[in-house]
Amino acid sequence: MTGELKGKIMNKIVKRILISAGAILGAIILVVGCYVIYVVASYSRIEDNLALTPEGSGSVEIATGEEYTVVTQNLGFGAYTADFTFFMDGGKESRARSADSVKACVKAGAEKVKSFDPDFAFFQEVDTGSTRSFKIDEREIVKEYFGGVSSSFAVNYHSAYLFYPILEPHGASNSGMLTFSKATIASATRRSLPISTGFSKFLDLDRCYSVSRVPVVGGKELVLVNVHLSAYGGSDEIRAAQMNMVLGEIQSEYDKGNYCVVGGDFNHDFTGDSTQKLNGGEEVDFGWAMPFPAEMMESYPAAVRAVDYSDGLKPTCRNCDVPYKEGNFTIIVDGFLTSKNVEVAGFEYSDHNPVVMKFRLA
């Protein structure tokens, strides 16, 4: 074989390799491009001031001077067993282990909250048809534990299919917040929180809080606000805007003469120093665990943060980059804010992350 012939053969081989590589690259670009178009085209925010339809009726009358119990619990879409790690926290997993695991986790959370016999209960990350939780309607599971009461449900976010991680995509998410009341909820509203308008909005998803109104003897209202603030994709400006809106809600209701209790997952270091006190004084920065902006409350004199714990500090959350074991990073992110005409009579954390508060209306 002559050198010229060898050269021609090599040129053909190289040409075919380049054509094949170009075709593969082109196909990848096309698929990625189509996916980006799908995500962008399917993105939409749920409208603000959306009226919700309360279900059921309660048998309790709310009056001043009486003691009531409220509990808040983030169900973590039914995935967070002790050894679960989450990819957005630096862990490995993007979905719950199994449908049975989801059901067991949700039932355990609902049972724990019910054990406090609360007059009011707030749940966050209640999935109703998400890939990550095997399309299980967690709302219906929780409702089985709270019969004979009034409830409202607000969709927090509904996302397009997230094709990441590649080997086990997180998928589509449909998740919301569920509020229970032994007194009848007269009306309820979904309020849209400020979120990023840039690309990070596709990571942060939609965000909201729900407002459930319960009549009080004498004509006023007890306003129950169930909240789940941003963790991923939120800038300092977005975090501040969300907190301003929540604090403004408290101030507005107080100015009307109403009573306001805000409970849920604030995705902040709720005490401002729990990351140090719960972790041996160590400064730990996971980005989303920013200190609660206590200085903002000066602009909302009616708002009070319930941090006078009767049983000491106990964590409500862990960073899910590694399976849990004693000594791992923990933090307090869940809690309650109230209007100052609500007297906090007792406050504690349970061993399984719900936050419990006893209060009276002044």
Cite the ranges covered by each PLM segment.
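Short, Lys/Arg-enriched N-terminal segments with co-localized hydrophobic residues
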Residues: 1-9
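Metal-dependent phosphoester-hydrolase catalytic domains
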Residues: 14-20, 38-58, 251-261, 267-362
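N-terminal, active-site-proximal structural segment of metallo-dependent hydrolase catalytic domains
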Residues: 14-145, 153-174
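Beta-strand-turn-beta hairpins that frame and shape the catalytic cleft
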Residues: 59-70, 79-82, 173, 177-187, ...
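Active-site beta-strand/loop signature of hydrolases that rely on acidic residues for catalysis
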Residues: 69-75, 106-135, 180, 212-214, ...
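Surface-exposed cleft-lining segments at the edges of enzyme active sites
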Residues: 92-99, 126-128, 193-201, 228-237
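Conserved beta strand-loop-helix elements of the APE1-like EEP
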Residues: 143-147, 172-188, 327-341, 359-360
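Conserved S-adenosyl-L-methionine
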Residues: 151-158, 188-194, 343-347
